[in-house]
């Protein structure tokens, strides 16, 4: 069948050949075939599209822009789609909106309906613009690239901040459930309750909680609040020592993309009587179009932590260490480094001159990682499935 496919590609015209090769994922072959076509016919929309789209797929972003813009100008809807995505990845909301408008015009002209992807990217552009208006000033003092399977082990929390537990801890402590379907669990210092995430029959994750009784046994578990998922999945709970403020991650309708970190507060009721308020997206630079999760703030050490796969390192996530603020202060909207601060292209942009952050880390970190108390060599590996 490969010989038949190759023969059919060879007998087709250059654009049909490019389309077939592109659909097969052979982007280098598309680039090789389309370069001379674009040179001969620089205004050919389809040739420019396949050249630009293949360069984009190969990660040659700068070179992809010109042919994609030419194709967009010729009314190729998919060229405008890719340019909109590229603008979102650069945190350029206004440029993204421009390409979304061109995308919409091309779809209208060709009498094609707007897809779910169109609606999703349009929402993301609006949300990105709103988030860029309120990027928080924080000091990121360190970043650590670690294996995604055990990322939580590098959170050096003091005992007052509670403990992050490996996924099998929930079943080992008697709360039931399949360890393979559990997220990192959280237990406060007083060991009064356990919070975790588990998948339901639809494959979506909900946050669960259970009280720990005086004899150390686990009371029956309950879903904290189905609304915390916001139509997606909710995972990675962390409860502040006030017993009210809950950080977690969801990938629902108010996420910029993938998992975003959210904050909610709960009432002082007991067990199933607790009510959770509308979750608030904590914004940038914590969140990104990628997966951002497991916010933990240690008031005793004055340090905070969160994890992200925004740097797209295979098998790894980046854990950022930062100094939490008592009061939120946002970066000035006209700051020329706004987008770079928002996406943390360099943590140095968040730091103050003359501060010895290495010394701050040395003096502020607890002497041990409390999460390590509950871990053992027999603990199963935690596969971070962000789907």
Feature map (PLM): residue ranges:
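Structural motif corresponding to the intra-repeat A-B loop/turn of tetratricopeptide repeats
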Residues: 24, 58, 90-91
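Short coil turns that delineate tetratricopeptide repeat
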Residues: 42, 74-76, 108
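Short, conserved micro-motifs composed of acidic
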Residues: 82, 89, 93-95, 106-387
């Amino acid at each position: 069948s490969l010989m038949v496919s190759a023969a059919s590609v060879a007998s087709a015209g250059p654009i049909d050949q490019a389309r077939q090769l592109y659909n097969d994922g052979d982007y280098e072959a598309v680039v090789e075939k389309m370069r001379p076509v674009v040179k001969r016919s620089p205004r050919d929309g389809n040739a420019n599209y396949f050249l630009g789209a293949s360069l984009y797929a190969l990660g040659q972003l700068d070179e992809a822009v010109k042919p994609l813009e030419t194709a967009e100008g010729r009314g190729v809807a998919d060229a405008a789609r890719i340019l909109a995505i590229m603008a979102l990845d650069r945190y350029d909301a206004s440029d993204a909106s421009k390409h979304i408008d061109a995308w919409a015009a091309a779809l209208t002209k060709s009498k094609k309906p707007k897809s779910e992807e169109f609606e999703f990217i349009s929402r993301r552009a609006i949300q990105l613009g709103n988030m860029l208006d309120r990027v928080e000033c924080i000091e990121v003092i360190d970043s650590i690239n670690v294996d995604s399977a055990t990322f939580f082990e590098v959170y050096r929390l003091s005992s007052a901040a509670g403990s992050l537990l490996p996924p099998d801890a929930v079943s080992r402590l008697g709360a039931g459930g399949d360890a393979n379907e559990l997220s990192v669990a959280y237990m406060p210092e007083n060991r009064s309750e356990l919070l975790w995430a588990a998948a339901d029959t639809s494959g979506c994750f909900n946050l669960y909680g259970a009280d720990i009784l005086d004899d150390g046994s686990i009371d029956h578990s309950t879903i904290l609040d189905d609304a915390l998922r916001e139509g997606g999945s909710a995972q990675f709970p962390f409860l502040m020592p006030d017993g009210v403020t809950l950080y977690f991650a969801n990938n629902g309708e108010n996420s910029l993309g993938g998992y975003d970190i959210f904050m909610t507060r709960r009432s002082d009721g007991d067990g199933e009587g607790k009510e959770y308020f509308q979750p608030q997206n904590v914004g940038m630079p914590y969140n990104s179009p990628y997966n951002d999760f497991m916010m933990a703030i240690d008031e005793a050490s004055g340090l905070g932590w969160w994890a992200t796969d925004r740097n797209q390192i295979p098998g790894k996530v980046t854990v950022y260490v930062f100094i939490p603020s008592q009061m939120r202060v946002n970066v000035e909207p006209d700051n020329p480094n706004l987008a770079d601060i928002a996406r943390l292209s360099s943590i140095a942009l968040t730091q103050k001159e003359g501060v010895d952050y290495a010394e701050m880390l040395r003096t502020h970190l607890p002497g041990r990682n409390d999460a390590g108390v509950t871990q053992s060599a027999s603990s199963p590996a935690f596969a971070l499935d962000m789907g």
